[in-house]
Amino acid sequence: MTLNSLPVWPALQAHYEEIRDAHLRDWFAPANDRAPTRAERFTFEGGGLAADFSKNLITDATLALLVRLAREAGVEARRDAMFAGETVNPTEGRAALHTALRANSPDAPFHAQVAAERAKMARFADAVRAGAWTGYTGKRIRHVVNIGIGGSDLGPKMVVHALHHVATPDIATHFVSNVDGADLARVLERIDPQETLAIIVSKTFTTLETMTNARSLREWFVANGCPEDALAKHFVGVSANPAEVVKFGIAEANVFEMWDWVGGRYSLWSAVGLSIMIAIGPERFAELLAGAHDMDEHFRTAPLERNLPVLQGLVGIWYRNFFGAQSYLVAPYSEALHYLPSYLQQLEMESNGKSAQIDGAFVDYPTSAVTWGEPGTNGQHAFFQMLHQGPTLVPIDFIAVLTPEHPLASHHPKLLANCFAQSEALMLGRTLDEARKIAGPAHPELAPHLTFPGNRPTTTLLVDALTPRTLGALIALYEHKVLVQAAVWNINPFDQWGVELGKILGKVVEADLTAPQVDPAKHDSSTSALIARARKALGE
């Protein structure tokens, strides 16, 4: 049953018409906001996090209808099927058991495999961190280079950056993803082959970008003095295809396994997170997993009415499918979470940017919104102008860490003040009458420019302190939000066929860029002209 054919759909449409012109300013007015206040009614906790939904365009009736939508759409059944290891990725015939990677019960699916691989990771990480694993000249490892792309890069990079304050200072971690040689070249300028460990991460070990960078890095090692028979001291592989890893030249003992029942964008909890474990240590990696498990249990057991991933997903549906929001913003007021927006871009848009329903029918309603963001306060000086005074509705997730993870504590009240003030300003706005008073009788023409419509919806997520455990919970919150929305939209969030066509045509174009001759009729006129210009520049 599709979204707009569910029994609750007409009631939601009617409710939207009732409140579409309401203003948050009025709902927060003292005369209307009596005990329990909106903040009290719409703030919920779970997995060590708190979420204030009160500055959203919702009422108690809205949430009741949205929860009914979740039930009618089968959110609970889809959730339970995922945790049970059922085939929730039907187009690829797979389970999606990233939750099993952080489950702490021997009854969890694949528990023995997961525990054995994590123990292998821990032994290796401890050896590298202690200096027992050395390079070909006997020097300890001081640089780790993670080569991967998509889920093999975004998650580990985000976590290593976020947990820099608890990472070992003895090892610098670098990430290379882009096939543009500049990405790898800039890292090569900063590392010494005698002290560098490369982690090559690819589910298939055939990914174009990853294998191109891996080959170039291997050539660099040899060109800079590493004997070929000593490369085993400097290369390890993470893959679901161990045979290809060995074929590449990595020693079998240096292969770490991931599994096809873990999607790439959900894989940082697996051996894909080896760079994380080396940076922060096995004990803190276990805390990262524990935090994600905390949120798993909250998602699995909390009533829908107080379930953070469910509420977050449903509020997103409310704006996407009723208010017509084209995008939503993630604004972490934490420089440590600098890479969270780019991580969430893949998590949300690669998962739910689909037009085909599970049964193959095409949707006739919007699915994934564009996800974007930048840490605060940087974003305030870039695009917040549009958020405050532009005509486009952009719902926002603010993320605030209440205690700093760095020694410059005097900065932190300023950071938090900006976060909370932005949510208040976006909600309240400034009326034309208020603007006229500010402009004064000498400059009445400025009043329209000083007017803020307000009524811009925001959710504020609060984290007491940024630790491996709270970070794990935060990531899992967004993972489960994606599943909730996928269930409501009746789509499969665990495949990504949309990346395939470009890959196929890319191989054809790459061959044409270096071929002796190219048939201009092989491509459309635009692509043929682009190839011709590139061939000329490349000297072909």
Swiss-Prot record:
Q: Which family does it belong to?
A: Belongs to the GPI family.
How is this protein annotated for GO cellular component?
cytosol
First-level EC class: isomerase
Q: Could you name the active-site residues?
A: 350, 381, 503
What is the documented function of this protein? Answer: Catalyzes the reversible isomerization of glucose-6-phosphate to fructose-6-phosphate.
This protein's pathway = Carbohydrate biosynthesis; gluconeogenesis; Carbohydrate degradation; glycolysis; D-glyceraldehyde 3-phosphate and glycerone phosphate from D-glucose: step 2/4
Q: What is this protein called?
A: Glucose-6-phosphate isomerase
Please provide, alphabetically and separated by semicolons, the GO molecular function terms listed in this UniProt record: carbohydrate derivative binding; glucose-6-phosphate isomerase activity; monosaccharide binding
A GO BP entry: gluconeogenesis
This entry's Enzyme Commission designation comes to 5.3.1.9
Indicate whether Isomerase appears among the record's keywords: yes
**According to its UniProt record, where is this protein mainly located?**
cytoplasm
